[in-house]
Amino acid sequence: MTTPNKGNKALKVSGEAGLGVCWAGHSYSALTPCAVPLQVKREPGENGTSLTDEELVTMSVRELNQHLRGLSKEEIIQLKQRRRTLKNRGYAASCRVKRVTQKEELEKQKAELQQEVEKLASENASMKLELDALRSKYEALQNFARTVARSPVAPARGPLAAGLGPLVPGKVAATSVITIVKSKTDARS
């Protein structure tokens, strides 16, 4: 199957897979950018030999100069111009491929970074909640300590009073502190 393209040149594409071959011999599909494949074009050279587009692009300057011997100045200019055009197409194609590849890589990195930012934001939010809970407990303990420090010392009465001794500010049972902290935290929730 042959498909027309720019410059009235033909593009050879295999019928089933839609695959083609670029000027440098790389295969491509309609989904991946590559240089526009060119119809094989032959230029007469020294002793009636001819060059394909691929040969013209891939040969060294020394080989090209040997091939150009015996051609008219106009033919030399035309052949060199065609070589330059073909090379530029190849450079443009590889640049397009590189740009698409870089874009895909950057989009992948962006998605990874967005996931990381979301994860860090979630961790930050949970740490803020934990910090608020700890702050509430701290404030409750401070308030309780102030209350105990301000309350007057009352003499102990009753049958167990002799064994307990007087109440001293600052000495409070641990269970009452925990109860106060829990009740303050539960009230705020």
Swiss-Prot record:
Cross-link (Glycyl lysine isopeptide (Lys-Gly) (interchain with G-Cter in SUMO2)), chain numbering: 41
Homology family: Belongs to the bZIP family. Maf subfamily.
GO biological-process terms attached to the record: adult behavior; in utero embryonic development; positive regulation of gene expression; positive regulation of transcription by RNA polymerase II; regulation of cell population proliferation; regulation of cellular pH; regulation of epidermal cell differentiation; regulation of transcription by RNA polymerase II
Pfam families, alphabetized: bZIP_Maf (PF03131)
Regions annotated as coiled coil: none
PROSITE patterns, A to Z: BZIP
Residue positions, PTM Phosphoserine: 151
N6-acetyllysine PTM positions: 80, 87, 98, 103
Keywords carried by this UniProt record: Acetylation, DNA-binding, Isopeptide bond, Nucleus, Phosphoprotein, Repressor, Transcription, Transcription regulation, Ubl conjugation
Residue ranges, annotated region (Basic motif): 80-103
Compartments (UniProt record): Nucleus
Placement of covalent cross-link Glycyl lysine isopeptide (Lys-Gly) (interchain with G-Cter in SUMO): 41
Assembly with partners or alone: Homodimer or heterodimer. Homodimerization leads to transcriptional repression. Forms high affinity heterodimers with members of the CNC-bZIP family such as NFE2, NFE2L1/NRF1, NFE2L2/NRF2 and NFE2L3/NRF3. Interacts with CREBBP; the interaction leads to acetylation of the basic region of MAFG and stimulation of NFE2 transcriptional activity through increased DNA binding.
CDD domains in alphabetical order: bZIP_Maf_small (cd14717)
PTM note: Acetylated in erythroid cells by CREB-binding protein (CBP). Acetylation augments the DNA-binding activity of NFE2, but has no effect on binding NFE2.
Name of this chain's protein: Transcription factor MafG
Organism (species): Rattus norvegicus (Rat)
